[in-house]
Amino acid sequence: MNTSNQFEISYPRLTFRRKILNLVGRALLRLLARPQVSGLEHIPAEGPVILAGNHVSTLEPLLMAVYPHRQVELIGAGDLPFEGFIDRLVAFYGFIPVNRGNLDRKAMVKALGVLEQAGVLGIYPEGGTWNPGRMKAQVGVAWLSHKAQAPVIPIGFSGFHNGFSKVLKFERPTLKMSVGEPIPAFRLDNDSLTVKDAYQKYADLVLERINSLVDPADFLLVPQKSDHAMRLRLESEGGSSEMVEIVGLQALAEFLFTPVMLNSLANNLKKPVRPLYPTQQTRQNKQFSEALQAVLDVLDENPGFLTYRMGVEQGHLAESAVRLLLQLLDTAHNTHKTIILDATMHAWYRDGRFEAKIHQYRITP
């Protein structure tokens, strides 16, 4: 049997510090919000267990950390720094950083080590917040459950859309944490599924159980389906224009209409991508080119940034469009032409609502 000094993380750790922070966290939540927590009795008093929840804001990890009666070791984003004071606070509390979009065996070994010490692991199977309610479950939760033979406790978080901004504005939002009954640990049955497919089936079950604990009204806040399109025109100084086709414009439109991805680049990574935000203002060729180059610089360091968030095909198409558009911008600058991008987004909601957004990027030489 392994002893604690054989693991990279000795569980439990930072016990006194975390107890104090948890007390402070609960007090702040009562002051700044209206937390409603139910079902904590479903969390086993001992043994390895995985807490798995949905994720739409920066607040869910706080509730997952401070309310269970056992110390929770959280898995979090290691590919992006957190914003402002949150980055320092999270580092002080401690978590297991995972490089999303790339195979991070080291993080998974650390997480498995926590479970092998009969610990509690907190995880978000969707892996991010950029498309809540429509994202595919990542198989990491199934792999960890299988290897450690740990049950999974589904947790539904409700009322968290724009929750952090509401807290900062002292609006005291109602934040619900609903803990469900345990899902037995994953076991590989002798059926026709491959191991990969079996893991995905289990991860999908976990996410389904999580979503069943979320207030239905929350799903009305995000589109059930959306599509994107983009047209590109070159306009000469005399006013004549011509349509130009490049690969990946639809994927590029999806990227530009996803604020979470742009915010990650601008706020977390401090990249100069503000010219890419959908506004009606005219941009200068140099500014827009620098913004696109900043995206490529991130992809050089983290190749999975787009593919993890958009899917492999869409991510590669968006990257291709960025590279081709950058070349076209150089040509347009040298020939004194204006580039016009007409981007559209259509969204359909579960309650029958339809939304259309149109943004034009006018990029002058």
Predicted regions and their residues:
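Non-catalytic C-terminal accessory region of glycerolipid acyltransferases
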Residues: 2-17, 106-365
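A conditional alpha-helix N-cap/helix-loop micro-motif detector
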Residues: 33, 101-105, 134
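A transmembrane-helix-recognition feature enriched in membrane-embedded lipid enzymes
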Residues: 2-38, 70, 84-93
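Catalytic core of membrane glycerolipid acyltransferases/transacylases, capturing the structured
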Residues: 21, 45-102
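Active-site phosphate/pyrophosphate- and oxyanion-stabilizing loops and adjacent acidic/basic residues
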Residues: 26, 62, 142
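Glycine-rich helix-loop-beta junction characteristic of Rossmann-like nucleotide cofactor-binding loops
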Residues: 40-44
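Conserved beta-strand scaffold positions in the cores of enzyme catalytic domains, especially
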Residues: 37, 74, 95-97, 152-154, ...
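Short, basic, glycine/proline-bearing loop/turn elements
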Residues: 24-26, 92-98, 124-129
